[in-house]
């Protein structure tokens, strides 16, 4: 699963790319149980906030 770290600027670039609906807030969040590891969020993020969970 991907997780979004504290460098998230909530720009919204990832939201339309995510097939499992990233949750919007002051920092965006990905539901680890729903994430399908597609990496679409990471490929469009301007600050590199989404990363594969260890």
Swiss-Prot record:
Metal-binding among keywords: yes
GO molecular function: 4 iron, 4 sulfur cluster binding; metal ion binding
Superkingdom as given in the UniProt entry: Bacteria
Cofactor(s) needed by this chain: [4Fe-4S] cluster
Binding site for [4Fe-4S] cluster 2: 18, 35, 38, 41
Pfam families named in the record: Fer4 (PF00037)
Cofactor note: Binds 2 [4Fe-4S] clusters.
SUPFAM superfamilies with a match to the protein in the record: 4Fe-4S ferredoxins
Keywords: 4Fe-4S, Electron transport, Iron, Iron-sulfur, Metal-binding, Repeat, Transport
Residues that coordinate or bind [4Fe-4S] cluster 1: 8, 11, 14, 45
Domain spans labelled 4Fe-4S ferredoxin-type: 2-25, 26-54
Physiological role: Ferredoxins are iron-sulfur proteins that transfer electrons in a wide variety of metabolic reactions.
Alphabetized PANTHER family for the sequence: PHOTOSYSTEM I IRON-SULFUR CENTER (PTHR24960:SF79), PHOTOSYSTEM I IRON-SULFUR CENTER-RELATED (PTHR24960)
Name of the protein in question: Ferredoxin
């Amino acid at each position: 699963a991907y997780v979004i770290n504290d460098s998230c600027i909530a720009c919204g670039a990832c939201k339309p790319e995510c097939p499992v609906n990233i949750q919007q807030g002051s920092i965006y969040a990905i539901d680890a149980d729903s994430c399908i590891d597609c990496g679409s969020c990471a490929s469009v993020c301007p600050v590199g906030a989404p990363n594969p969970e260890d």
